[in-house]
Curated annotation (Swiss-Prot):
Compositional bias (Basic and acidic residues): 254-269
Protein name, per record: Vacuolar membrane protein FOSTERSB_4073
Main location: membrane
Keyword field: Membrane, Phosphoprotein, Transmembrane, Transmembrane helix, Vacuole
Family membership noted in the UniProt record: Belongs to the PRM5 family.
InterPro entries: PRM
Superkingdom of origin organism: Eukaryota
Cellular location(s): Vacuole membrane
Length: 314
């Protein structure tokens, strides 16, 4: 018996790619906090192998689920403790701080402007008042009584008194500047000195000459100003002498280096016990008229002055 090998017949079928099916389902509730369930379902089908002898087919299905919690803020309706930021602009804090700083700067600027205006107004008022006083001084008599004048009669009297005081001060200052007694540094007759020797007697005699000339020119000053009378001045000199005698001893007859008031010759010679002020100018200067016999009768200082100037020969 002959055995034959049996070879089964196989038919090849074209295989397709596997198909993947995914299904996702989600649900969310806004009114109540709920959980959403996500389910995924995938189904895969394997390729089928068919043959003439037998055919097989298989399929697989898988599913998964994930729970996710959702947070929902509470509603602002009817709740005063929750700030509703939707109704206010962004940067509210910065706007409030900037408004406060701006208000401070604006108040400082307003204060500066007001103070400057008030000071300028006060200055203008004072300057206008001073100009008006100087401009209308002495013209109140000619002004009409119907006009409103800001200056009264008392003001006019005070202006006249000020003018009189200024004129008297000017006259006294001119008189005092004209003669500075017993000051060889400031006296005009010492400007052209040819020697360095200072003669007290010569200065006294020259001062008496200039003082007598000046008295003849300005005698009206003594009439207008009672403070320049000789009697008043002598009383003042006596009081000063009493005060000085208590502090220091009596000084010798020497020229004073400080300026004195007018008519101080009598008080000066009285204080120094000198009789030169009682001698007339002609007799005080008579010794210089005869240079031949002057060295026997004139003072030693004048003789030495003549020798130094070349008017006397030893």
């Amino acid at each position: 018996m002959v055995k034959k090998n049996f070879i089964p017949s196989v038919s090849l079928v074209r295989r397709d790619l596997p198909t993947l099916v995914t299904t996702t389902t989600s649900s969310t509730a806004l009114s109540k906090p709920t959980s959403s369930v996500v389910s995924e379902t995938s189904s895969k089908s394997l390729p089928s192998l068919t043959s003439s002898a037998f055919s097989t087919s298989s399929g697989a299905t898988s599913s998964s689920s994930l729970i996710v919690a959702s947070i929902t803020p509470p509603s602002t309706a009817g709740n005063p403790f929750i700030l509703n930021a939707a109704d206010k602009p962004n940067g509210t804090v910065y706007i409030a701080v900037g408004a406060v700083i701006g208000a401070i700067f604006i108040s400082i600027l307003i204060w500066w402007l007001v103070s400057x205006y008030l000071s300028r107004r006060f200055t203008m008022t004072n300057s206008y008042a001073n100009d008006s006083k100087n401009l209308y001084r002495g013209h109140h008599k000619h002004s009409s009584s119907l006009q409103s004048n800001p200056f009264d009669i008392n003001d006019e009297k005070s202006y006249m008194q000020d003018d009189w005081d200024s004129m008297s001060q000017l006259e006294s200052s001119q008189y005092e500047d004209a003669a500075s007694p017993f000051n060889p540094i400031q006296d005009p007759f010492t400007d052209n000195r040819r020697s360095l020797f200072i003669s007290p007697t010569l200065q006294v005699s020259q001062y008496e000459k200039s003082h007598s000339r000046h008295q003849s020119k300005d005698t009206n000053i003594f009439i207008d100003d009672p403070s320049l009378y000789v009697g008043t001045y002598l009383e003042e000199e006596e009081e000063e002498e009493r005060k000085l005698n208590l502090n220091r001893p009596q000084r010798a007859a020497s020229p004073e280096r400080k300026e004195k008031k007018i008519n101080s010759m009598e008080g000066y010679h009285k204080r120094n016990q000198s009789s030169l002020g009682l001698i007339p100018v002609a007799s005080a200067t008579s010794n210089t008229s005869s240079p031949k016999k002057a060295h026997k009768r004139q003072a030693p200082s004048m003789f030495l002055d003549d020798v130094l100037n070349g008017r006397e020969i030893i």
